[in-house]
């Protein structure tokens, strides 16, 4: 069989950071804008030279697509729109609020996913780009088993989770080791009788661990030729779109010959001449490739420091705003309302992972102030509603 090595490049776009502020410079989101513009420019150049590379984008909606990019970099939105139409780029779901999906109630989770697709403010992926794949690349790769049924109810085809060689991972260390054939193909995850597809996903660390993307692709293909792998494989590299990994370092010779130093241009060029390589997207690959393995785990996953939730849960500040969140939820429940409660939208916005971490031991002061404002406001709204209800009765 003429098995192929499919390669996809995923850009995780969130311009609202826990460790940087809200200014259009390197102390805020200026680096995001610079690097994303360069990614689009380099991808376009490659396509114009006949290289059929495709990008996969997962945008956060509330802050990036709704506020920051329209004001400071509308050309990025236009550039991705053009690439979707002209070169087959794909948009997948992150979550409306770059939210901690695994920490949400059913109603909060549903809103985060549904509003990411389309919403009244016009910042949904379908609103902006005209289409999206019902595949979720959750913010910080946060996933909780009990939400499989919710993903299925919402028509989600698959979830992308890190299966990484470094402790910035999701599920590699909590299941038996997968063979390369299965590790680079979709797998079926099952929890309490409910199943969904998980797409193993990789970072720049996995590329560096292999030596280079070319080395990784050639190693997998050699196993295809030897019969160790009897299927196509898909290397899906997904990293923050502001990562320097995507940007050429422009090093002088001979340093510029070192692998992984020429950004997205180098990552594409080093495999573009391999006849067994096909450029693809998660949605494109899943259309023609079924899961090859069944996996089970019962832990929550996240890609924080040393893999896990400590980056978002262990600071005293985290406990303060989480207590307020639970208080607002309790008031809403007492009022026999959740998605219709006065605090609901504020709760969804507070549940942005950025209001909890990844930064440690403290967040950017602008981010802390925003989280404190939101959390205080949601409680006050619920208290006011409770007082109003008592007066009516």
For each of these PLM feature ranges, what is it?
Residues 2-30, 34, 192-196, 200-203, ...:
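Active-site and substrate-binding clefts of carbohydrate-active enzymes
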Residues 205-217:
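C-terminal accessory segments of proteins
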Residues 98, 165, 203-205, 286:
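Residue-level detector of flexible, active-site-proximal loop/helix-junction positions
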Residues 69, 104-107, 211, 248-252, ...:
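Short, solvent-exposed loop/turn segments at secondary-structure boundaries
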Residues 136-139, 237:
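Short, conserved catalytic/metal-binding motifs centered on acidic residues
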């Amino acid at each position: 069989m003429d098995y192929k090595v499919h390669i996809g490049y995923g850009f995780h776009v969130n311009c609202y950071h826990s460790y940087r502020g809200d200014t259009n410079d390197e102390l805020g989101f200026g680096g995001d804008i610079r690097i994303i513009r360069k990614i689009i420019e380099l991808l376009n150049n490659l396509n114009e030279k006949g290289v059929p590379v495709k990008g996969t984008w997962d945008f956060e909606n509330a802050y990036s697509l709704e506020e920051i990019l329209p004001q400071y970099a509308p050309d990025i939105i236009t550039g991705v729109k053009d690439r979707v139409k002209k070169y087959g780029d794909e948009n997948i779901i992150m979550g409306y609020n770059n939210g901690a999906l695994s920490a949400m109630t059913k109603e909060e989770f549903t809103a985060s996913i549904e509003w990411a697709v389309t919403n009244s403010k016009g910042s949904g992926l379908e609103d902006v780009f005209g289409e999206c794949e019902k595949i979720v690349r959750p913010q910080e790769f946060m996933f909780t088993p009990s939400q499989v049924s919710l993903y299925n109810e919402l028509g989600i085809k698959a979830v992308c989770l890190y299966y990484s060689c470094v402790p910035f991972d999701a599920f590699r260390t909590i299941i038996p080791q997968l063979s390369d054939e299965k590790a680079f193909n979709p797998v079926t995850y099952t929890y309490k009788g409910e199943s969904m597809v998980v797409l193993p996903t990789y970072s720049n660390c996995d590329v560096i661990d292999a030596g280079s993307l070319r080395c990784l692709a050639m190693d997998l293909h050699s196993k295809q030729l030897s019969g160790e792998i009897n299927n196509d494989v898909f290397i899906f590299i997904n990293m923050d779109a502001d990562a320097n990994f995507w940007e050429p370092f422009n090093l002088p010779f001979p340093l510029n010959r070192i692998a992984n130093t020429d950004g997205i241009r180098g990552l594409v060029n080093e495999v573009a001449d391999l006849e067994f390589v096909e450029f693809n997207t998660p949605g494109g690959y899943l259309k023609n490739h079924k899961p090859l393995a069944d996996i089970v785990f019962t832990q929550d996953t996240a890609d924080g420091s040393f893999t896990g939730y400590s980056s978002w849960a262990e600071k005293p500040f985290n406990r303060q705003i989480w207590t307020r969140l639970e208080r607002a939820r309790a008031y809403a429940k007492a009022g026999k309302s959740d998605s219709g409660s006065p605090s609901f939208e504020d709760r969804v916005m507070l549940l942005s992972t950025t209001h909890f971490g990844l930064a440690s031991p403290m967040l950017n002061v602008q981010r802390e102030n925003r989280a404190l404002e939101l959390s205080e406001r949601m409680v006050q709204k619920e208290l006011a509603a409770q007082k109003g209800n008592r007066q009516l009765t």
